[in-house]
């Protein structure tokens, strides 16, 4: 599995808390509801032609599968901690950079692929831009290759 270090899954503390909250909801709400749906469908009699029963059983399978997946992620979670006070780019760093040619400035956080959410300016550590930036320092100029090559200057690295 990607994003593993010695079979650990890299996550931010925030993402781990989101996963734990989702797991709690699935166990305490969704699982209970689907069990009731199955009971209600069974009470309608013949299961061989009972579409409600089939739908509820399929839904139960999806819920149970997601519960197992989340439990595995939690059991293998390793919290990402940025290098506090360092100007070096690492997983967990918030980075501001400037495209040397266009002057365009971007700011994002480098996170694991499980945490990645481009709409929240969180990019995967496996993305080409993150790969180019990891290990670099504030002030460095780095070449990035995404369909075409371009240079960026690291303006700021925040590790908190």
Swiss-Prot record:
<dbReference type="InterPro" id="IPR028624">
    <property type="entry name" value="Tscrpt_elong_fac_GreA/B"/>
</dbReference>
<dbReference type="InterPro" id="IPR036953">
    <property type="entry name" value="GreA/GreB_C_sf"/>
</dbReference>
<keyword id="KW-0175">Coiled coil</keyword>
<keyword id="KW-0805">Transcription regulation</keyword>
<comment type="function">
    <text>Necessary for efficient RNA polymerase transcription elongation past template-encoded arresting sites. The arresting sites in DNA have the property of trapping a certain fraction of elongating RNA polymerases that pass through, resulting in locked ternary complexes. Cleavage of the nascent transcript by cleavage factors such as GreA or GreB allows the resumption of elongation from the new 3'terminus. GreA releases sequences of 2 to 3 nucleotides.</text>
</comment>
<comment type="similarity">
    <text>Belongs to the GreA/GreB family.</text>
</comment>
<dbReference type="InterPro" id="IPR006359">
    <property type="entry name" value="Tscrpt_elong_fac_GreA"/>
</dbReference>
<dbReference type="InterPro" id="IPR001437">
    <property type="entry name" value="Tscrpt_elong_fac_GreA/B_C"/>
</dbReference>
<dbReference type="InterPro" id="IPR018151">
    <property type="entry name" value="TF_GreA/GreB_CS"/>
</dbReference>
<keyword id="KW-0238">DNA-binding</keyword>
<dbReference type="GO" id="GO:0003677">
    <property type="term" value="F:DNA binding"/>
</dbReference>
<feature type="coiled-coil region">
    <location>
        <begin position="2"/>
        <end position="84"/>
    </location>
</feature>
<dbReference type="GO" id="GO:0006354">
    <property type="term" value="P:DNA-templated transcription elongation"/>
</dbReference>
<dbReference type="InterPro" id="IPR023459">
    <property type="entry name" value="Tscrpt_elong_fac_GreA/B_fam"/>
</dbReference>
<keyword id="KW-0804">Transcription</keyword>
<protein>
    <recommendedName>
        <fullName>Transcription elongation factor GreA</fullName>
    </recommendedName>
</protein>
<dbReference type="GO" id="GO:0032784">
    <property type="term" value="P:regulation of DNA-templated transcription elongation"/>
</dbReference>
<dbReference type="Pfam" id="PF01272">
    <property type="entry name" value="GreA_GreB"/>
</dbReference>
<dbReference type="GO" id="GO:0070063">
    <property type="term" value="F:RNA polymerase binding"/>
</dbReference>
<dbReference type="Pfam" id="PF03449">
    <property type="entry name" value="GreA_GreB_N"/>
</dbReference>
<dbReference type="InterPro" id="IPR022691">
    <property type="entry name" value="Tscrpt_elong_fac_GreA/B_N"/>
</dbReference>
<dbReference type="InterPro" id="IPR036805">
    <property type="entry name" value="Tscrpt_elong_fac_GreA/B_N_sf"/>
</dbReference>
């Amino acid at each position: 599995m990607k994003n593993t270090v010695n079979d650990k899954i890299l996550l931010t503390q925030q993402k781990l808390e989101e996963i734990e909250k989702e797991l709690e909801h699935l166990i305490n709400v969704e699982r209970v509801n689907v069990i009731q749906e199955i009971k209600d469908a069974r009470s309608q009699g013949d299961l061989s032609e009972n579409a409600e029963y089939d739908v509820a059983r399929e839904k139960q399978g999806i819920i149970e599968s997601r519960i197992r997946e989340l439990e595995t992620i939690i059991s293998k979670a390793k919290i990402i901690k940025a290098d506090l006070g360092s100007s070096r780019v690492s997983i967990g760093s918030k980075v501001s950079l400037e495209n040397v040619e266009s002057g365009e400035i971007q700011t994002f956080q480098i996170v694991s692929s499980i945490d990645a959410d481009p709409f929240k300016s969180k990019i995967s550590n496996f993305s080409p831009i993150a790969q180019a930036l990891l290990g670099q320092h504030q002030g460095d100029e780095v070449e990035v290759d995404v369909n075409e090559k371009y240079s960026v200057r690291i303006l700021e690295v925040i590790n908190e």
